[in-house]
Amino acid sequence: MSKKRIYEYAKELNVKSKEIIDELKNMNVEVSNHMQALEDDQIKTLDKKFRQQESNNNTKQNTQNNHQKQQNNNNNKNNNKQSNKGNANQKGNNNNKNNAKNNKNNKNNKNNKNNKNNKGNKNNKPAAEPKEMPSKITYEEGITVGELADKLNIESSGIIKKLFLLGIVANINQALDEETLELIADDYGVELEKEVVVNEEDLSIYFDEEEADPDAIERPAVVTIMGHVDHGKTTLLDSIRHTKVTAGEAGGITQHIGAYQIENAGKKITFLDTPGHAAFTTMRARGAQVTDITILVVAADDGVMPQTIEAINHAKEANVPTIVAVNKIDKPTANPDRVMQELTEYGLIPEDWGGETIFVPLSALSGEGIDDLLEMIGLVAEVQELKANPDKQAVGTVIEAELDKSRGPAASLLVQNGTLNVGDSIVVGNTYGRIRAMVNDLGQRIKSAGPSTPVEITGINDVPLAGDRFVIFKDEKQARRIGEARHEASVIQQRQESKNVSLDNLFEQMKQGEMKDLNVIIKGDVQGSVEALAASLMKIDVEGVNVRIIHTAVGAINESDVTLANASNGIIIGFNVRPDAGAKRAAEAENVDMRLHRVIYNVIEEIESAMKGLLDPEFEEQVIGQAEVRQTFKVSKVGTIAGSYVTEGKITRNAGVRIIRDGIVLFEGELDTLKRFKDDAKEVAQGYECGITIEKFNDIKEGDIIEAFEMVEIER
């Protein structure tokens, strides 16, 4: 005899298979799924619980079920009694059953049929009560009709009907936009709340500023020194370092890690050792906001110079306070007042003149005024109330990075919040790792670093970029997963942005000596056109670059053509042919330049102009949709009507169109009429049918593709 499976046993008792599985697990029985067979001893143990529950539940059921249970019990107890007595009891019970039926309505009769096997329903409800509609639901972008119906506890057909009344034809898998969702929710009186999906691979989310953190404590200010070349930025940095660092570290060797810390009046200050604003701008371009205070160095004998203005603009865009250090005041030709006067034109007005900008006269060479500058930095930092929480997981920014021959990839980091520890799992930029060693700006090995502390770490898998952000994760697997995902995404992005040749950048690459040959793939509608075009292109004579035909063929542009163009760094010219869907996707992904023409002269002129650096297109063709001709109708005085189904994008009334048959362009012109049912339509979207007539063209056949396009003006 075959053994009874879990789901069969559950069905017999009218309970869920999960309840049986849970009970078996409580009995220390390993269960793989509901198809597992039960042993006899397991069934006996389960019977003790579930049969007893069933018996208790049945005593609470309606009159009919009570009599039925009593009949079963009597039959079990009186097995040895005479059959006629058993029949009498049976009749008595049947009478009771009939009486119970007469006292119940039709709805209960249906439930009695369902309960004929003595199922253990606790409440003996006649039917499952409909769930109450919630007053508020949350949704994700792209929610479908079916998913919305589940959230509202209603049938999806109800939503589909409402959409139909709103003029929207939809099915259960149709995605709903926010406007449609609001209409439906308003109709049902339900409040909507959009769920924000957090992308854990986006490191910027870990840098979001929270409300006032009660555990935050004061942290050192991070200072960047900027200014014009030869105005004394490096000398000022060296002077501060020599005065405050080397003097306090007898015999100590300062490790160059792109930043260093000093202590002044009992408070630490972190200086970014990146003179100039190139690195500063690079960091800001990558979203890194690391600087708290900017020091603008201006030579007293030279005044405001072009790079000074550039530095002022960078500081303003970064929205950080600026302290002006008027350097070289010990020179005979120094004129600090002239510097102040010139800087007022750029919004930097000295406090002495009623402004808010602090000016500090100093000499980086002699050290005069250095203490005053450090004091002003401390005052500005105090006003800013710079705080951070050292008890959090560390986050921060890469200052510098290099590939060391002995240690592998090394990165100088600035901790902006939290505490960085040796052994932490880190994601930095598009790489990850586990911190193996950590060195401070004095070359000392340390085990932890708090906010605003610059350190150099090793243990990461690759070299990050300056300005990349880093985040510490408790779980090493999570750090690995996020790091690998970010690396993969960056590789894909680099492929998409690979510098393939196009007619737009051809002349630029020629000037840089990067282009010697222009590789061309030609696809045409007939062999004669292909040969004529190839011969014409070979005759183009421009100094510095040769046209090289690497492939010619007849037919539509396909994916293998794009692959060849990408591998050979070439362009594709289509003459009276179009790319198929796969070729379009591949060209966009690989950034391959495709040029489609119908006149040979235009091809020659375009390529020759590009090679001479004269190419200046003002408009670009943009395909907006395709429709497949399903049926044609010939109407007198109208012409051929193409009954079409929009397969991609949309067809608009004012768009240009071309008729494509077997990948060959037959005609290019304009729409005459566009109708949806009997009404004129401005546009017909994907998934809908429409009637189309083409101006001055009636040779439309079933299976033809109508491609709609617009000419879009592009910036050069």
From Swiss-Prot:
Region (G1), start-end ranges: 227-234
Region (Disordered): 52-135
Region feature G3, mapped onto this chain: 273-276
Cysteine pairings via disulfide bonds: none
GO-annotated molecular function: GTP binding; GTPase activity; translation initiation factor activity
Pfam families according to UniProt: EF-G_D2 (PF22042), GTP_EFTU (PF00009), IF-2 (PF11987), IF2_N (PF04760)
Any one cellular-component term (Gene Ontology): cytosol
Stretches for region G5: 363-365
Localization: Cytoplasm
UniProt-listed SUPFAM superfamilies: Initiation factor IF2/eIF5b, domain 3 (SSF52156), P-loop containing nucleoside triphosphate hydrolases (SSF52540), Translation proteins (SSF50447)
Region feature G4, mapped onto this chain: 327-330
InterPro entries registered for this protein in UniProt: EF-G-like_DII (IPR053905), IF2_II (IPR044145), IF2_N (IPR006847), P-loop_NTPase (IPR027417), Small_GTP-bd (IPR005225), T_Tr_GTP-bd_dom (IPR000795), TF_IF2_bacterial-like (IPR000178), TIF_IF2 (IPR015760)
Record key words, sorted: Cytoplasm, GTP-binding, Initiation factor, Nucleotide-binding, Protein biosynthesis
Gene3D superfamilies: 1.10.10.2480, P-loop containing nucleotide triphosphate hydrolases, Translation factors, Translation initiation factor IF- 2, domain 3
Region of interest: G2: 252-256
Boundaries of every tr-type G domain copy: 218-387
Annotated binding of GTP, by residue: 227-234, 273-277, 327-330
Function: One of the essential components for the initiation of protein synthesis. Protects formylmethionyl-tRNA from spontaneous hydrolysis and promotes its binding to the 30S ribosomal subunits. Also involved in the hydrolysis of GTP during the formation of the 70S ribosomal complex.
Stated name of the protein: Translation initiation factor IF-2
Species this protein is from: Staphylococcus haemolyticus (strain JCSC1435)
Gene that encodes it: infB
